[in-house]
Amino acid sequence: MVSGSGICAKRVVVDARHHMLGRLASVVAKDLLNGQNIVVVRCEEICLSGGLVRQKMKYMRFLRKRMNTKPSHGPIHFRAPSKIFWRTVRGMIPHKTKRGANALARLKVFEGVPTPYDKIKRMVVPDALKVLRLQAGHKYCLLGRLSSEVGWNHYDTIKELENKRKERAQAVYERKKQLSKLRAKAEKVAEEKLGSQLDVLAPVKY
């Protein structure tokens, strides 16, 4: 994502759908420390290896970890998929140092694809894709489904908003395809009409 110099002003939007949690977090953490600005969308579609029951048991064990005298002091147990991913990245960054805090500030995480980023080209990370990293037939579960099982209440809302966004995107794509056909047809008609005049203009690359 980032050049060897570690300087890249451009913000990279990563589509987290069907990426493995730890592998994606490690790549994102490294690039954040190198100076890259990163936005991660569709965090609810991130995959975890292991079945849902197993992952839920692990998370319930994590929920029991707290400070006896004052539980609000920590650890903080995030339920939202975006915050779980953010916390995973934070664990791979020296976030208590100035450099680490600045790196973490360059990360934005979202469920779904909010409006500023739905019109920006999204990237994937091949090193973290489920189809390349998880053995065929191996059990896995989605982070959004796990979150909904342990107290996150917006899974259905995000799914509904995502369906609406996909419908809008499909309508835009169909319109663009139609305009492309009309343009090709108009160019063909103009080519037939102009004929020899185009041969005159060709040397000057008009």
UniProtKB/Swiss-Prot annotation:
InterPro entries: Ribosomal_uL13, Ribosomal_uL13_CS, Ribosomal_uL13_euk/arc, Ribosomal_uL13_sf. Signal peptide: none annotated. One of its GO terms (molecular function) is structural constituent of ribosome. Pfam families: Ribosomal_L13 (PF00572). One of its GO terms (cellular component) is large ribosomal subunit. The keyword Chloroplast does not apply. Gene3D superfamilies: 6.10.250.3250, Ribosomal protein L13. The keyword Lyase does not apply. GO terms for biological process: translation. NCBIfam families: L13_A_E. Belongs to the universal ribosomal protein uL13 family. This is Large ribosomal subunit protein uL13z. It comes from Arabidopsis thaliana (Mouse-ear cress).
